[in-house]
């Protein structure tokens, strides 16, 4: 090879006027007579230079530029705009997005029925979308979706029975506004109010309160529009097995078109927020679970701070002191100061004087702080400590209607993984819920995970829906729900990718170290399908241990044999073999 390369250089050199000079130089370099070290080095590097010149000349003559190359203007690359008939649909945190040409919005039950019948006949996809808020994009399908946003009417309110019948496209916030006029409300609420009713029951959403079940338990009856069997009515009396299976059906058994919900009288709650420690929580946990209608803990990693939030109906005998020790500005001022200091460290001094900082809420400030360096553990710890101090200064009481009190500002866009696991009974909690948290916090510190706050822990009673993560045949069983997060406080694609990779590392470590030991299973709206085949096989085996997968797939094949309602995520979580399909 060396001889060939040398011969090529000699041929190229022979075409130039100085070829004889170069030839003598090469001969000198290839001479076998011993030379002093310094002269040898000099001639070695001269040879490298000659080799480089030869390669450059070869490249120039082999790949010549066009004659007008110097006169052409650079044209920046532009993405082609989306066609007018292509809809972009993403979830709340913009972590999952699809583009589709088929996004139907029927405005009545007959139109929905006809759309599904046509899709069934033509073997086309038509995945029920809901509000599309699920963190894992469970409802998204580029092949086609149906959204019931135009089917949002309240059909009937029975004040005596305290029930309401609605079209499934109505949003929770709109339903609550209507129920208010009748002195009614929903029994419990998830953190946000923008979900459609059909979606919130299909994924097994929940609020908090060890005596209160997930929201699917509030469903008394429903109308399910299926591709193969049309519109069917389900209730505890009419086909109870399918009714319970379809209440938390993940949109795979049919499109929920109408729902009758059990309501409760509209009521006020007093919320008590205070800061505790892990030891204090352990001492009082059993009592707090049984005494409080609604309760949750917000754990702050790398601190000994636990924010306890208790909500109960007002008492005739005891009126709490509603005035807080600190005003809102006082409670948040140290967070503003930290942000300004961090701006000086990470950016410029001028930006730290931005008057807009004083108008930001705590969650907005937290997002901006994290955006500066979201994966630096020490930076995240400083933010977590500032959050602990914020909650300490925000201790106190507030009173309002239940739908107002039970909401929660989750912060900005984020990755989230929430698991559900048994925690004993209300009469006899097994304390594994606190063991889980203790192990989780130790894992975070051991692995140096830049885990932001909070780790939210809630409780519910059990559900009779077999596909619910809180499913149980024992009525007094309780379940704990624990959510870990990483915020996506930036629009920078590279930074979001890095946060995403770190989050899945965080989630993987919790899965490996905790899930099996506590029989923990992810919320259906937050479960992510592994890309690795072995990991997917392991996940499918875990799901079979907990859920009636065969019964669910059998119902799918009866109601939707052409898989009109399925998407890639559902197909991977609940694969149906050809033999099962034929049966």
From Swiss-Prot:
GO terms for cellular component: mitochondrial membrane. GO terms for biological process: L-ascorbic acid biosynthetic process. Pathway: Cofactor biosynthesis; L-ascorbate biosynthesis. Involved in the biosynthesis of ascorbic acid. GO terms for molecular function: D-arabinono-1,4-lactone oxidase activity; FAD binding; galactonolactone dehydrogenase activity; oxidoreductase activity. PROSITE patterns: FAD_PCMH. This is L-galactono-1,4-lactone dehydrogenase 2, mitochondrial. SUPFAM superfamilies: FAD-binding/transporter-associated domain-like.
């Amino acid at each position: 090879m060396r001889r060939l390369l040398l011969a090529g250089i000699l041929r190229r050199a022979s075409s130039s006027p100085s070829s004889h000079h170069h030839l003598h130089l090469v001969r000198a370099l290839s001479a076998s007579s011993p030379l002093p070290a310094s002269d040898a080095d000099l001639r070695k590097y001269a040879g490298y230079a000659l080799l480089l010149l030869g390669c450059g000349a070869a490249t120039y003559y082999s790949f010549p530029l066009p004659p007008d190359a110097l006169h052409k203007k650079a044209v920046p690359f532009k993405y082609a705009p989306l066609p007018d008939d292509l809809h972009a649909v993403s979830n709340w945190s913009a972590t999952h997005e699809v583009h589709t040409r088929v996004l139907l919005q029927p405005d009545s039950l007959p139109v929905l029925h006809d759309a599904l019948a046509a899709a069934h006949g033509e073997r086309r996809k038509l995945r029920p979308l809901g509000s599309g808020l699920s963190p894992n994009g469970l409802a998204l399908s580029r092949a086609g979706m149906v959204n019931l946003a135009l089917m949002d009417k309240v059909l009937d309110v029975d004040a005596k029975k305290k029930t309401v019948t609605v079209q499934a496209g109505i949003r929770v916030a709109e339903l609550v506004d209507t129920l208010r006029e009748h002195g009614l409300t929903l029994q419990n609420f998830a953190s946000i109010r923008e979900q459609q009713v059909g979606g919130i029951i299909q994924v097994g959403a929940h609020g908090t309160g060890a005596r209160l079940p997930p929201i699917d338990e509030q469903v008394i009856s429903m109308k399910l529009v299926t591709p193969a069997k049309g519109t069917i009515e389900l209730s505890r009396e009419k086909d109870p097995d399918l009714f319970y299976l379809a209440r938390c059906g993940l949109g795979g058994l049919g499109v929920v078109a109408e729902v009758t919900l059990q309501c409760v009288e509209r009521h006020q709650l007093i919320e008590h927020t205070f800061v505790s420690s892990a030891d204090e929580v352990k001492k009082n946990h059993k009592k707090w679970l049984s005494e409080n209608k609604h309760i949750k803990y917000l754990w702050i990693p790398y601190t000994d701070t636990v924010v306890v939030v208790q909500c109960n109906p007002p008492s005739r005998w005891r009126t709490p002191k509603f005035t807080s020790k600190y005003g809102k500005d006082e409670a948040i001022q140290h967070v503003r100061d930290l942000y300004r200091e961090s701006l000086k460290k990470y950016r410029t001094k001028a930006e730290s004087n931005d008057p807009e900082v004083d108008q930001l809420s705590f969650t907005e400030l937290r997002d901006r702080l994290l955006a500066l360096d979201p994966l630096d553990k020490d930076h995240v710890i400083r933010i977590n400590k500032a959050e602990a101090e914020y909650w300490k200064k925000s201790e106190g009481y507030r009173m309002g209607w239940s739908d107002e009190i039970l909401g929660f500002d989750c912060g900005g866009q984020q990755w989230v993984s929430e698991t559900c696991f048994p925690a004993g009974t209300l009469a006899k909690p097994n304390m594994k819920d606190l063991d889980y948290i203790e192990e989780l916090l130790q894992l975070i510190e051991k692995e140096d995970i830049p885990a932001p706050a909070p780790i939210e822990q809630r409780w519910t009673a059990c559900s009779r829906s077999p596909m619910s993560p809180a499913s149980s045949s024992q009525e007094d069983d309780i379940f704990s729900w624990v959510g870990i997060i990483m915020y996506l406080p930036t629009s920078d694609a590279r930074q979001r990718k890095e946060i995403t990779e770190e989050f899945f590392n965080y989630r993987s470590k919790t899965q490996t170290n905790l899930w099996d030991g506590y029989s923990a299973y992810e919320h259906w709206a937050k479960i992510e399908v592994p890309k690795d085949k072995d990991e997917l096989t392991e996940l499918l085996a875990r799901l079979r241990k907990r859920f009636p997968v065969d019964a669910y797939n059998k119902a799918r094949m009866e109601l939707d044999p052409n898989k009109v309602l399925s998407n890639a995520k559902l197909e991977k979580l609940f694969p149906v073999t050809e033999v099962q399909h034929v049966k």
